[in-house]
Amino acid sequence: MSDLHMEFAENSRYIKHNEFPVTGDVLVLAGDTFYLNNTVAPLSKFWKWASANYRQVLIVPGNHEYYQFCDVMERGLQWKWMLKDNVGIYQNQVVCIDNTDFILSTLWSNIPAQDEYWYYQSLHLSVRGFLKGAQASVNDKDVRVLYGVW
């Protein structure tokens, strides 16, 4: 499963009032769950439900986890953050469950220097369009982090 986007109120309400069908022992959430610097989202009742219904919950950060001025390198290149005993967010980790290796890593693009301006403009245009003309809260550093331009 991916793209829960718990940072959006409508999605959080839906998740709060609707349970997902349990379809296995391990739940993998492949990105875009909540902003990593959000102090409320990790306390969501969803994690209690997931912990009770799955043997293991493996969360991999996507690009949206690093929005809202969360520095991609703040935690380093390899880390894990346990929300519950069996619910964790993993970056550049391998978790072995029953002889199956789960390789948990955010994949970033390597944008050639000559294309940096095009990606920069595209991100700003898409964010402004999404916000319907409102001032976007994206700075130059965010653009470089999101698109892997260093």
Label each residue range with its predicted role.
Residues 71-90:
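Glycine/small-residue-rich loop that forms an oxyanion/phosphate-binding "nest" at active or ligand-binding sites
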Residues 20-23, 88-97:
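Short acidic low-complexity segments
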Residues 60-62, 92, 105:
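Generic beta-sheet signal
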Residues 1-59, 65-74:
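N-terminal active-site segment of His-dependent metallophosphoesterases
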Residues 1-5, 99-108:
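Active-site-proximal beta-strand elements of phosphoester/diester hydrolases
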Residues 103-150:
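Active-site-proximal loop/helix segment associated with metal-binding centers of metalloenzymes
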Residues 36-37, 67-69, 97-102, 110-113:
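Short catalytic/ligand-binding loop motif for oxyanion handling, primarily in non-cytosolic enzymes
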